[in-house]
Regions:
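An extended, acidic, His-containing surface patch that forms the Zn2+-binding/catalytic region
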Residues: 63, 238-269, 323-423
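Short, small-residue-biased leader/transition segments that mark boundaries at the very start
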Residues: 1-7
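Active-site beta-strand termini and strand-to-loop segments that position acidic
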Residues: 76-80, 203, 375-378
Length: 423
């Protein structure tokens, strides 16, 4: 690797130049190397092995924490002592779909017109590699005078966050003061995000011939009653859901390029519940003996997972607990921190010097690995989601990250990590 290049257009002062270890070409090549590794909801262990070898070249120790034979996390540290800043990105990517739909091969990094094309460039191998390079350059320049940076590269974020949950269960977050998730954020700094739950309600009746329906119990009718009552419960909640700990309006207004009204703001910042799937019956001349309804619920601190579980059980008791059950296959908590916590303060102060625009501060309507890392953040860990890339490019055909944004965020991260730990 090159270690003697300091690009003048990226360097802000002499200290920055001293912290630059890798050339721009090297930084792009490193991203290309991990884009090449096809981690479509599997095989993250190959990225772990690549990063472990890379970090070892710069005397940075790391550990592979296996989920199974093909899926794993990587943990690496530089510095020592408190405070501990955890930095995290996931190694899995979503399916690339039909490769013929892509202008360029999805698992070969293509550098064209100032854009780096490839699956995962934005979501989120670009952010992950920017963090890794920032660690390397801080280590090589001996710029870190206080505290510890702990890299947590995770598996399975796009599915059930089991990589992050494993690291949390094994104590890798127990001593952290701050956490940065490097998801693509379009130059928005997120101080909090919503949670997400999947709930499946099943109605079980009794089959009978449609000519003799009185001999059966119609599961569809029972489930329709449940859905209608839950709809009324949700309406009642939204009528009172007027004060929000999470303010997602700045994010939405930036993306939509317009102001939004009060009704919209209640949706974006508040509790959201959607009945997205309804299935019942097998054939037209039979009384259906089974029906299912699936809900996606976006939770907030005021209406968390415990509230949702209690709500579903309450409606089931009222409609018919002899016929209805609820299963919750996935549940990720909302995560909140102070809007002006030290990480957010450093990001909003430092990043504009590199990205040449003010940083909007907002809550995020999606979820991240922080749900598994921090839960509801009862320990009040300083928290930020901030990373290179436009969030609208995530999961898209011809996914790309702007080259200048990827390179700039390496410098942003170096300065933010250092400033946070020193103060």
């Amino acid at each position: 690797w090159s270690s003697d290049v300091c690009s003048s257009d990226l360097t802000k002062n002499e200290e920055d130049c001293e912290m630059t270890v890798l050339s721009e070409q090297d930084k792009i090549r490193l991203l290309a190397d991990i884009v090449k590794i096809q981690t479509e909801n599997n095989h993250e262990i190959e990225v772990c092995e690549y990063l472990k070898d890379l970090l070892s070249q710069y005397d940075i120790d790391s550990k592979i924490v296996k989920v199974n034979d093909s899926r794993a996390n990587l943990v690496a540290e530089i510095g020592s002592g408190a405070p501990v800043l955890a930095i995290s990105g996931h190694m899995d990517v979503v399916d690339a779909g039909d490769h013929d739909d892509w202008t360029f091969p999805p698992f070969e990094l293509t550098d064209k017109d100032g854009k780096l094309f490839g699956r995962g460039t934005t979501d989120m191998k670009g952010g992950l590699m920017a963090m890794v390079i920032a660690m390397i350059e801080l280590k090589q320049s001996n710029a870190l005078k206080q505290g510890t940076i702990r890299l947590l590269a995770t598996s399975g974020e796009e599915t059930e966050q089991y990589g992050a949950q494993l690291l949390a269960d094994e104590g890798y977050l127990d001593d952290v003061s701050g956490l940065i998730i490097g998801e693509p954020t379009s130059n928005i700094a997120y101080y909090a995000h919503k949670g997400s739950m999947s709930c499946v309600v099943t109605a079980k009746g009794k089959a009978a011939h449609s000519s003799m329906p009185h001999l059966g119990t119609n599961a569809v009718d029972i489930l329709v009653d449940f859905v209608n009552e839950m709809k009324q419960e949700y309406k009642n909640i939204k009528e009172h859901d007027k004060v929000h700990e999470l303010d997602a309006v700045p994010m939405i207004e930036k993306h939509l390029h317009r102001k939004i009204g009060e009704e919209e703001s209640h949706i974006y910042s508040g509790f959201v519940m959607l009945n997205s799937v309804f299935n019942g019956g097998k054939q037209v001349n039979s009384v259906p003996h089974k029906a299912t309804a699936k809900y996606n619920v976006r939770t907030v601190p005021e209406y968390d997972s415990t509230f949702v579980k209690d709500l579903f059980e309450k409606v089931i008791r009222h409609v018919g607990e002899d016929y209805l059950t609820v299963d919750i296959p996935s549940s990720h908590d909302p995560v909140a921190s102070d809007r002006d916590n030290p990480l957010i303060q450093n990001i909003t102060r430092i990043a504009p010097n590199y990205v040449h625009e003010d940083i909007v501060v907002s809550a995020l309507i999606g979820t991240t690995d922080a749900s598994s890392f921090l839960g509801t953040n009862e320990n009040n860990v300083d928290f930020a989601v901030f990373g290179p890339g436009e969030s609208i490019m995530a999961h898209q055909v011809d996914e790309f990250i702007r080259k200048d944004m990827y390179l700039s965020y390496i410098d942003v991260y170096k300065d933010v990590f250092k400033a946070y730990l020193e103060k």
